[in-house]
């Protein structure tokens, strides 16, 4: 048996929930604790529940741990439609209400962080707390963009057309391109395994995956992060992979503190996906923070 096959056998079994007449994939591990909230782990763009397998394994002895594939990603359905933060916010909120059955600690990476923040701000009855890991989403007072480059605008408009978008999708889902992208956003290259590349590529082979890819890039921006923080009341933990080339974590961290001073944050030697790159550190910090909420 290969190392990949051995690792796969230690993952929580797939389960499915029907939402809006579509099949939504999730996993659950661990036992409910009366005095501890369940965890709900939410992946980033192009990822899935598979990206959390190290965290599920490390946290399931202390918590009931759920992870879900957002509609359009992973093993969840990929119907034609508009994909946006409001869709995933509704999905997460209704999943907590219907399947988990009590408020959860939402932990989200990148796009999943933004969707989780939307739930915590707009549906406080679903959120016992929020953990953000290199979360996506702009602030209202972000620096104004430079004068638009007409060539860049033309390229963007062309790429949003069906054929160029499809060709771009075919390119970015190649294993060699996935590996190259991971090499850009992971500091520890040993964490970039064949298994990880396969986990990211597999959903891109599903019918509808190319349309989801195009729809996400066409979707309008949702609520700004500061607007969401001003509505939120639950505890907040932020874990930054400080080596992330896609965001200035220190500057973004200062913005979060400006709008939500009562937070806990840690900066880790990792890239865009600290939960997968340094899972032991993330699991320890998350565990200690959640257990400390009731004290």
Question: Which residues does each PLM region occupy?
Answer:
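Conserved catalytic-core motifs of eukaryotic protein kinase domains, centered on the activation segment
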Residues: 51-53, 76-82, 142-143, 249-250
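Conserved hydrolase catalytic core segment
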Residues: 101-146
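Conserved loop-alpha-helix segment in the C-terminal half of the alpha/beta-hydrolase fold
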Residues: 231-270
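Catalytic active-site module of serine/aspartate enzymes centered on a nucleophile-bearing elbow/loop
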Residues: 261-295
